[in-house]
C-alpha cells in the first residue's frame, strides 16, 4: 500500500460527527490524500463535519454519496483514524475546495442501526438466560448481519438459544424508544447499571444508550425504536476460543427469509414423502429402513456362509493346508466377513485374498488355528508382501490386511505372501 502525504486545505483537529441526528450535511474537505493498493487508486477525504459513521466499535462504516453542483461521487467506505472520520472514494472531486452535500445511504444505515440495537438486546438476553458471567468479547455489526462474541463455558443448548430469541423479539414487539444521554458521566452510567466493556477506556463524558431495561455505553448508531428491527433470528452459535462463544444473527427481512427458507424445505420434504405429517413420515421411513437393513444383513451373512461352504468344498487340503489365493472384486467388508467364516470352517486355512478398491490394491491374509500354532504370523506376512505394491499394513497373528499404491503389484504381493507362509508351514 502506497499512501501519499495529506494535502491540507484548512486545519482540523478532529471530525465533527452529526450522524446521530441527520443523514445529510453540508461539508467541506479539510484534507485529502491518495492511496494506491494492488494497482488501484483511491482517495481518502476528511470533512469538517460529517453524517457518515466511521468504522469503529464493531460497527462498519457508512456508505453513500457526496454531491456538488457538477458531480456525484460514491463514498464506498468510511473509516476512523486518530479522531478523524475518513471517507473512501474512487475519484477525487474536480474542485476539492468546493462545498459538498454528504448523503448517507439511508437503507444501509437503518439496517446497520437495527442490527446494532438488536446486538444490545441480545447481550441483555444472554445475561438473563446464561448468567451474569456473560461479557462481550467482540462484535461485528453490518447492514446484513450481526455477530456477537461473549464469554461462556459451554455450547448453548437449543432451548437456551430459543429463550434468547424470544426475549429479543419480545423487546422488539414492545417497541422501546431510543433513550440516550450523550453527555453522561461515568458515575451516572454506573448508577444506571449501564453495561461497560471490560478493559475499555472511557472519557469524562460518555454516550449512554437505553432501550427498555437494556442500558449500555455505546458510540454506534441505533434505531429510533426497537419495533423497527421487525424480527430477530439466530443463525448459529459456535466456539471461537476457549471460554468464548460466537452468535451470528439477522433481523428484519433477512430474518424472514430464514423462516421462509425453512418452510420451503419442510414443504419440499412433505411433498417428497407424500405426507403432510413430516415427523411421523420420517420416523416411519427410518423404522422401515432399519427393518430392511436387518433383512439385508441377514441375507448377506447367509450369502457369505454359502460362499464359504462352496469354497471349502472345492478346495482340497494339500501339504497340510487348505490354500485359497485369489483376486476378487468384492468389497473389503465382504472379504473380511468371508475370511472369518472360512476360518471357522477350516483349521488349516491359508487365505490370501487380493482386491482393488478405488484404484488402490488391498491384501488380506487369514490363517487357521493349526497354521498360527506353527508360528506363522499374518501381520508379518502382509508387511513384507505389501512392499511389492508400494504399501504396508499389519494386524493380528491370524488376520492382517495391507493397502498399497500400485495395483499392478497386487498379484506379486499375493504370490509373495503364499511363498512366505509356505516356507514356514511344516
PLM features per residue range, with description:
Residues 1-426:
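A glycine- and charged-residue-rich anion-binding loop/surface
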Amino acid at each position: 500500500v502506497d499512501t501519499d502525504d495529506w494535502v491540507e486545505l484548512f486545519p482540523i483537529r478532529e471530525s465533527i460527527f452529526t450522524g446521530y441526528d441527520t443523514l445529510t450535511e453540508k461539508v467541506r474537505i479539510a484534507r485529502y490524500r491518495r492511496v494506491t493498493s494492488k494497482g488501484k487508486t483511491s482517495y481518502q477525504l476528511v470533512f469538517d463535519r460529517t453524517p457518515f459513521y466511521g468504522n469503529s466499535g464493531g460497527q462498519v462504516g457508512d456508505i453513500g454519496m457526496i454531491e456538488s453542483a457538477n458531480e456525484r461521487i460514491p463514498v464506498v467506505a468510511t473509516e476512523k483514524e486518530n479522531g478523524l472520520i475518513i471517507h473512501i472514494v474512487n475519484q477525487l472531486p474536480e474542485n476539492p475546495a468546493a462545498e459538498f452535500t454528504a448523503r448517507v445511504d439511508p437503507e444501509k444505515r437503518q439496517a446497520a442501526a437495527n442490527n446494532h440495537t438488536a446486538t444490545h438486546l441480545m447481550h441483555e438476553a444472554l445475561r438473563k438466560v446464561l448468567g451474569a458471567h456473560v461479557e462481550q468479547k467482540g462484535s461485528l455489526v453490518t447492514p446484513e448481519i450481526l455477530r456477537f462474541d461473549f464469554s461462556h463455558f459451554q455450547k448453548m443448548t437449543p432451548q437456551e438459544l430459543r429463550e434468547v430469541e424470544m426475549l429479543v423479539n419480545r423487546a422488539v414487539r414492545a417497541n422501546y424508544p431510543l433513550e440516550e444521554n450523550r453527555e453522561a458521566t461515568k458515575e451516572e452510567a454506573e448508577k444506571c447499571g449501564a453495561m461497560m466493556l471490560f478493559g475499555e477506556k472511557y472519557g469524562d463524558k460518555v454516550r449512554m444508550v437505553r432501550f427498555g431495561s437494556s442500558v449500555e455505553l455505546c458510540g454506534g448508531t441505533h434505531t429510533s425504536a426497537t419495533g423497527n428491527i421487525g424480527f430477530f433470528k439466530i443463525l448459529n452459535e459456535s466456539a471461537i476460543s476457549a471460554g468464548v462463544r460466537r452468535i451470528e444473527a439477522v433481523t428484519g427481512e433477512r430474518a424472514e427469509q430464514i423462516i421462509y427458507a425453512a418452510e420451503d424445505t419442510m414443504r419440499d420434504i412433505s411433498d417428497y414423502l407424500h405426507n403432510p405429517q413430516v415427523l411421523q413420515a420420517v420416523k416411519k421411513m427410518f423404522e422401515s429402513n432399519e427393518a430392511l437393513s436387518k433383512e439385508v444383513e441377514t441375507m448377506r451373512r447367509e450369502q457369505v456362509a454359502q460362499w464359504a461352504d462352496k469354497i471349502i468344498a472345492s478346495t482340497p487340503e494339500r501339504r497340510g493346508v487348505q490354500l485359497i489365493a485369489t483376486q476378487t472384486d468384492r468389497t473389503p467388508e465382504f472379504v473380511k466377513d468371508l475370511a472369518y467364516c472360512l476360518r471357522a470352517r477350516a483349521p488349516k486355512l491359508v487365505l490370501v485374498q487380493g482386491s482393488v478398491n478405488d484404484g488402490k490394491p488391498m491384501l488380506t491374509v487369514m490363517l487357521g488355528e493349526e497354521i498360527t500354532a506353527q508360528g506363522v504370523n499374518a501381520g508379518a506376512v502382509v508387511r513384507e508382501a505389501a512392499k511389492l505394491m508400494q504399501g504396508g499394513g499389519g494386524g493380528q497373528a491370524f488376520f492382517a490386511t495391507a493397502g498399497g499404491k500400485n495395483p499392478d503389484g497386487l498379484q506379486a504381493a499375493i504370490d509373495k505372501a503364499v511363498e512366505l507362509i509356505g516356507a514356514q508351514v511344516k
